[in-house]
Structure formats: structure tokens, C-alpha cells
């Protein structure tokens, strides 16, 4: 019985990955150059636990579950992000993970799309 359940999960995630890769594109990729935090004009400044390409297994699974389509597999996405405020009093003020600017932050920090790494200079 366990073998059937694990086979079902494996087929589900394989199908999910195939659907994500075969879906038409919707968002444009962002340049990967590191920019100063003061010039974060591509979106909001975020502190993400993980920053990955959209085609990575964990990012592709989340994008598929949320029904999000991205243009190109080289788009950077941030996973489990918190905002960094200009004043430094937000929940992400002490960013020890990856500070990024992200264009699409509509998923309450679960996943942010179109991210560009930044240099906080702290």
C-alpha cells in the first residue's frame, strides 16, 4: 500500500513539473547583477531564506501549486521572504540570508518572483 501511495505522489510531482514547464510564459526575467539597496527600483527590498531559479524543484513545485507562470526558467524567485524596511525596524531588519529586490510579492512572503540580489553594505 505504501508503494502505491509513494508512486502516486511521485507521478503527481512529475506531472506538476511537466505542466509548469509546458505552460506559456507570463513574467519577464530580471537581470542578475547585484545592486546597492538604495537603488532597489525593481521592487520591494526583501530578506529571503532561499533564492533559486524558477526551474529548481522546490520553486517549481510552489509555483505550480500556486498556479503561477513565469517567463523563462532563469527568473530568480525568493522563498520565505520578509520585508526589509528603509528605517531598519521591520521583521527583516537583520537579514542573515539573501537580501533581494523582488517585483511580484503577492504571496505573503511564501514566494517572491523576479528577484535581484542586492548589497546591503552593512
Swiss-Prot record:
Keywords: Cell wall, Disulfide bond, Secreted, Signal. It holds the Pfam family Hydrophobin. Residues 1-22 form the signal peptide. GO terms for molecular function: structural constituent of cell wall. GO terms for cellular component: extracellular region; fungal-type cell wall. It comes from the Eukaryota. Induction: Expression is low during in vitro infection of pine seedlings. Disulfide bonds join 40-101, 47-95, 48-81, 102-115. It is found in: Secreted; Secreted, Cell wall. InterPro entries: Hydrophobin. Its main location: secreted. Belongs to the fungal hydrophobin family. Self-assembles to form functional amyloid fibrils called rodlets. Self-assembly into fibrillar rodlets occurs spontaneously at hydrophobic:hydrophilic interfaces and the rodlets further associate laterally to form amphipathic monolayers. Aerial growth, conidiation, and dispersal of filamentous fungi in the environment rely upon a capability of their secreting small amphipathic proteins called hydrophobins (HPBs) with low sequence identity. Class I can self-assemble into an outermost layer of rodlet bundles on aerial cell surfaces, conferring cellular hydrophobicity that supports fungal growth, development and dispersal; whereas Class II form highly ordered films at water-air interfaces through intermolecular interactions but contribute nothing to the rodlet structure. This is Class I hydrophobin 2.
